[in-house]
Amino acid sequence: MTTAKTAISALVVMGVSGCGKSVVGAEIALNSGGRLIEGDVFHPAANIEKMSAGIPLTDEDRAGWLTRLGEEVASALENGERPILTCSSLKLRYRERLREAVPGLGFVFLELSKEVATDRCAHRPGHFMPASLVDSQFAALEPPHGEPRTLVVDATQSVDTIGKQAAAWWEESRVG
């Protein structure tokens, strides 16, 4: 766990496919009064088609998507909201791109093993991301250990526990 040195403006719930970004993001929103922004909704159709076909996205595929996510979070902040974005943010350069768009951005990294992620993806109904892409996600992952405004949590804990922990960490950054 890393403590926040300065106030966190918004959160990104990050990690590989199957780590629980959507359910944890919703729980953090519930515990913090924030607004969940589901990053997958902003993928262009071509990205969804590639992932559905088991083809990993390239940095180029993600570029416009990351720009759009940064704009959405910045807009939410301008409207006085407390945004919580779900986004894999696997590489440092992706996180830096989001940080450039949103000053004070914090990250909650849902850390888990490849085996657990694969099992979760294999048993997740109705999602476009196949379990076959988990290996490529771990290959691309640059864990954010030691990065500023980053909370690392064990993603095998209960959603309730993670949501409360992350919301408290966020609030603590705001009050000093």
Where are these regions (language model features)?
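Conserved lysine of the Walker
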Residues: 21
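The conserved Walker
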Residues: 17
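Small-molecule kinase domains that catalyze NTP-dependent phosphoryl transfer to phosphate-bearing small molecules
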Residues: 123-165
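Glycine-rich phosphate-binding loop used to anchor ATP phosphates in small-molecule kinases
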Residues: 60-102, 110
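Conserved substrate/cofactor phosphate-moiety recognition/catalytic segment
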Residues: 26-71
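Conserved phosphate-donor/acceptor-positioning beta-strand/loop module used by diverse small-molecule
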Residues: 102-121, 153
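Extreme N-terminal, non-catalytic leader segments
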Residues: 1-8
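Hydrophobic anchor at the beta1->P-loop junction of P-loop NTPases
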Residues: 13
